[in-house]
């Protein structure tokens, strides 16, 4: 599978099914706490990392001669308990390379997001390529101070260092992701024929991207500083920087393995780069190895049960790291209890509940695929949204009643229910499991860990800086909706921001511990559909403010934790995040406007170069369904999916039950059940299928439970290095394949592994047990709607 996932590809037609994820357990889980006294490799690593941050500068600031370290083995494996406050990082070198990378990444990702299939430059690729860029800079520029009047500067204030490298990673992180507002702009300009101009586009983008930054800064006491807020995604980035910069660390033997982390990274990187050519290009059947469907390719039941494209993946197999890590990142980053809870959720809801519903014809499952993210009419065809719109793109009730209600596959409908359950579950989970901890931390912060102690060497960003950012861009958002004819009242923005703020801490805690984020996308669409129906633009704006404010804010919080681990001065972090984000907004809007003005038939289904704007099309369809048709016609009264409303209550009751089991039997496996993860951890199904989650959780449990328990030294030395190597090798291979072969339409010679293996009902999306004869006037579903 060439390409990568931007937001949640789950936004297929009806847009997102629950883009969820999360977890949480008591922060004091014994699985995370490891005694220092018997951790020999940990001691070796402490000795080795003693010089990690002083490559260029003498002594390192430490506490108690390195005897103090993080209580979490994950952090000890990736982050040295050291710092050198004198290390320069606010340098011309850092700003130049960082802004170049931000510009290229934002422009490339924006441009190719308009194409199907797409390709995405990831932050890990930026992190990897920044290393040789910094080396080349040092070869070109002298270490010499220049003066212009009273201004002094140096292009090379010593050899490049880890802090400069880390700040470039931060700038890439905030600029590489496509702004959600660009989908609003595309929907307006292409489908609704509204063009408000560059001023509107840039104000909308800046406001929606940066309101969340204020929330991130205001939540530092709860989401960034506590040692228990691990943010596992950062540990891989820290490990990669450490691996690249310190090839000479003392090479302690780990369970018989003597190879250095750098050489280990290099070998795995090369192997994954080469291997990806097979499932992505040479032998694509390796990606979704649905071998049972090859035996019975035309059996709807076999393809529904064993299929891996539109089935429920019984006997799952994949040999493609893209399939394993594309939706919820590398499994080597997730804690074992999070992996187990998500695995339980997949088995319960998609191996037991889904076939039980589908094969009893619940929600007319006989006539629908068992797993698909499309919306379907009562003839079994893709739902034709244009048939229910007037010429000015407003809802035509008569046309709707003369056409068809909306139907969904069983997994898609169930995913909405699970999204409802996860929204209520996360609130009750955080109150029950973490409420006292939050209260105590706000009232009397606990003693800092070693990393927080080391950060005291730097001036903190004042509270009012973040508050000012929040208020400034909130004001810009208000000015945007009234400065242009958006038909969006002020209270829609306020309610959207309140939604983000209320769920920011609960979802942030879960994400910081488990690396799984629960999304508010479905919830915001659902609420605005009831609250302000018939206003598609208002729906899109509310969703962006209510959902992206939280998502973007949590991404900023994750970067703040990365800076915390890498001992980056907080005020320099503030400047780099703000400047890179603002600059990337201008870059993305510039690229978008250029593409709309210079690519013929852009965003049209017949565009010859495949610049069909798939995300924007899905976003438009979503605005019609939620903003025009509205959830009332799907989830209320006697409509087909009304029963899904009970999942709100299921999320509450399930979480209370799991909490009671935890209080009674905290050491038993049933005491570790986690409501938000069980209900919401599978939020990318569909378009993901169970094979993505089963392979992900299986590999994750092998490394983060079995190897961590049996071969702890090996795990601590190599686990995150392995994750970084697999990700970067695969992603770089995907990029080269895309630009060198896929973009110029150079296909591998036809053979069964790229052709015949996909001639199944599962692969073609046609695994349906019953069909209707539309020409004879047959249809399924209710007689009236």
UniProtKB/Swiss-Prot annotation:
**Signal peptide as annotated in the record:** none
Q: Which family does it belong to?
A: Belongs to the oligopeptide OPT transporter family.
Keywords linked to the UniProt accession: Endoplasmic reticulum, Membrane, Peptide transport, Protein transport, Transmembrane, Transmembrane helix, Transport
NCBIfam families reported in the protein's UniProt record: ISP4_OPT (TIGR00727), OPT_sfam (TIGR00728)
Where's it found, cell-wise?
Answer: Endoplasmic reticulum membrane
> Biological process GO annotation list?
protein transport; tetrapeptide import across plasma membrane
> What parts of the sequence cross the membrane?
94-114, 121-141, 167-187, 196-216, 264-284, 339-359, 413-433, 461-481, 490-510, 512-532, 537-557, 572-592, 611-631, 642-662, 683-703, 732-752
Q: Where is the composition biased (Basic and acidic residues)?
A: 10-26
Q: What membrane topology does the UniProt entry give?
A: Multi-pass membrane protein
Q: Which terms in the GO cellular component ontology are assigned? A: endoplasmic reticulum membrane; Golgi apparatus; plasma membrane
What is the protein's name according to its record? Sexual differentiation process protein isp4
Q: What is its main location?
A: endoplasmic reticulum
Q: InterPro entries, per this entry? A: Oligpept_transpt, OPT
List the molecular function annotations (GO) for this entry.
oligopeptide transmembrane transporter activity; tetrapeptide transmembrane transporter activity
Q: Quick one: where's region Disordered?
A: 1-28
Q: Does the keyword Transcription regulation apply?
A: no
**Name of one Pfam family that matches:** OPT
């Amino acid at each position: 599978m060439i390409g990568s996932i931007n937001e949640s590809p789950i936004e297929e037609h009806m847009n997102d099914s629950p883009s969820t994820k999360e977890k949480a357990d008591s922060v004091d889980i014994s699985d995370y706490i490891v005694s220092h006294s018997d951790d020999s490799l940990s001691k070796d690593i402490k000795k080795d990392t003693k010089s990690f941050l002083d490559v260029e500068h003498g002594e390192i600031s430490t506490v108690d001669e390195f005897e103090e370290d993080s209580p979490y083995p994950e952090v000890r494996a990736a982050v040295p308990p050291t710092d050198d406050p004198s290390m320069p990082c606010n340098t011309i070198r850092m700003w130049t390379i960082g802004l170049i990378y931000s510009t290229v990444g934002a422009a490339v990702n924006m441009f190719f997001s308009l194409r199907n299939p797409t390709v995405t430059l990831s932050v890990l690729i930026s992190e990897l390529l920044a290393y040789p860029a910094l080396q080349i800079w040092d070869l070109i520029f002298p270490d010499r101070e220049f003066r212009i009047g009273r201004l002094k500067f140096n292009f090379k204030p010593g050899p490049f260092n880890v802090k400069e490298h880390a700040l470039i990673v931060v700038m890439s992180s905030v600029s590489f992701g496509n702004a959600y507002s660009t989908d609003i702009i595309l929907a307006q300009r292409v489908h609704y024929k509204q063009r408000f101009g560059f001023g509107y586009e840039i104000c909308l983008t800046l406001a929606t991207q940066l309101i969340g930054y204020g929330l991130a800064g205001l939540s530092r006491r709860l989401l960034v500083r506590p040692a228990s807020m691990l943010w596992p995604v950062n540990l891989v980035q820290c490990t990669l920087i450490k691996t690249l910069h310190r090839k000479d660390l003392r090479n302690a033997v780990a369970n018989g393995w003597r190879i250095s982390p750098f050489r280990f990274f290099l070998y795995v990187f090369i192997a994954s780069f080469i291997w990806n050519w097979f499932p992505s290009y040479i032998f694509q059947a390796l990606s979704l190895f649905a071998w049972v469907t090859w035996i019975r390719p035309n059996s709807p039941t076999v393809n529904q049960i064993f299929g891996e494209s539109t089935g429920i993946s019984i006997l799952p197999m994949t040999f493609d790291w893209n399939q394993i890590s594309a939706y919820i990142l590398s499994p080597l980053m997730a804690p074992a209890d999070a992996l187990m809870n998500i695995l339980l959720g997949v088995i319960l809801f998609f191996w037991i509940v889904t076939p039980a519903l589908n094969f009893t014809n619940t929600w007319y499952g006989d006539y629908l695929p068992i797993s698909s993210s499309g919306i379907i009419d009562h003839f079994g065809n893709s739902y034709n949204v244009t048939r229910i719109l007037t010429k000015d793109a407003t809802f035509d009730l008569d046309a709707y009643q003369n056409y068809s209600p909306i139907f969904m596959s069983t997994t898609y409908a169930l995913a909405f229910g699970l999204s409802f359950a996860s929204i209520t579950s996360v609130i009750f989970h955080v109150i029950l499991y973490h409420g006292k901890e939050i209260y105590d931390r706000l009232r009397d912060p606990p003693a800092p860990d070693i990393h927080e102690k080391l950060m005291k060497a730097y001036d903190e960003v004042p509270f009012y800086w973040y508050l000012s950012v929040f208020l400034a861009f909130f004001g810009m958002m208000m000015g945007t909706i009234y400065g242009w004819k958006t038909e969006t009242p002020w209270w829609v923005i306020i309610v959207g921001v309140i939604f983000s703020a209320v769920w920011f801490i609960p979802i942030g805690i879960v994400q910081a511990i488990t690396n799984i984020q629960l999304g508010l996308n479905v919830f915001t669409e659902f609420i605005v559909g009831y609250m302000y129906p018939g206003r598609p633009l208002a729906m899109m704006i509310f969703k962006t403010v209510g959902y992206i404010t939280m998502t973007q804010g949590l991404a900023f919080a994750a970067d703040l934790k990365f800076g915390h681990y890498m001992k980056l001065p907080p005020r320099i972090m503030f400047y780099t995040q703000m400047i890179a984000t603002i600059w990337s907004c201008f870059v993305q809007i510039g690229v978008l406007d250029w593409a709309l003005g210079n690519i013929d038939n852009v965003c049209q289904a017949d565009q010859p170069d495949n610049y069909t704007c798939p995300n924007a099309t899905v976003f438009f369809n979503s605005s019609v369904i939620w903003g025009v048709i509205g959830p009332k016609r799907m989830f209320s009264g006697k409509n087909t999916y009304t029963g899904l409303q009970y999942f709100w209550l299921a999320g509450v009751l399930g979480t209370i039950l799991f909490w009671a089991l935890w209080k009674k039997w905290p050491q038993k496996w049933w005491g570790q059940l986690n409501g938000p993860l069980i209900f919401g951890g599978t939020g990318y199904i569909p378009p993901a299928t169970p094979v993505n989650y089963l392979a992900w959780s299986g590999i994750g449990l092998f490394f983060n439970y079995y190897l961590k328990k049996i071969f702890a030294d090996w795990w601590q030395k190599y686990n995150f290095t392995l994750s970084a190597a697999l990700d970067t090798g695969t992603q770089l291979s995907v990029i080269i394949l895309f630009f060198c072969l896929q973009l110029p339409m150079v296909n591998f010679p036809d053979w069964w592994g790229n052709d015949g293996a996909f001639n199944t009902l599962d692969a073609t999306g046609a695994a349906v047990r019953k069909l209707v004869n539309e020409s004879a006037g047959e249809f399924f579903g209710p007689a009236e709607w």
